[in-house]
């Protein structure tokens, strides 16, 4: 709905990609194209978003993003927003409330305590994430039709 309503022009999907058989951003992109009908040219994968801190820093420094609408699990939204804002990214959040409150959801909620402690350490220590070179994917997606 965010793309079709014009609230966003490009979608940056971020996650881990340790092997060719496990590709979180690739899976997200396929879902958005096949199920939501979003043009593939408007979806940019970040395959080095190993954690929320890396994702926020990379969005700003590698992809040139200055403001973002974060869509994430409800239990993760506050930490994601705080992380992005503390790393210089102007962000607002939209929680995904569609996930059932099953064992996976409760596990995710439970690990938030440790994840929040790690986030504080990352921000305070200014940990340098895996960056790589700049990526023009977002700029190119903005210019595509």
Region spans (language model):
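A general structural signal for short secondary-structure boundary/capping elements
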Residues: 92, 114-121, 137-143
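The feature marks non-catalytic terminal segments
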Residues: 125-145
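A transmembrane-helix-recognition feature enriched in membrane-embedded lipid enzymes
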Residues: 106-128
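A structural signal for short, hydrophobic/glycine-enriched beta-strand patches
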Residues: 1-109
């Amino acid at each position: 709905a965010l793309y079709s309503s014009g609230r966003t022009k490009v979608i940056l999907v971020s996650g881990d990609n340790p092997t060719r058989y496990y590709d979180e951003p690739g899976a997200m992109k396929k879902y958005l194209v096949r199920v939501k009908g979003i043009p593939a040219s408007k979806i940019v994968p970040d395959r080095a978003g190993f954690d929320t801190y890396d994702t926020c820093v990379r969005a700003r420094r590698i992809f040139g993003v200055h403001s973002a609408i974060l869509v994430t699990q409800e239990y993760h939204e506050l930490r994601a927003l705080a992380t992005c804002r503390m790393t210089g990214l102007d962000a607002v959040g939209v929680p995904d409330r569609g996930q059932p409150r099953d064992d996976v959801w409760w596990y995710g909620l439970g690990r938030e305590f440790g994840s929040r402690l790690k986030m504080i350490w990352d921000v305070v220590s200014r940990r340098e994430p895996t960056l790589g070179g700049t990526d023009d994917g977002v700029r190119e997606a903005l210019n595509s039709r």
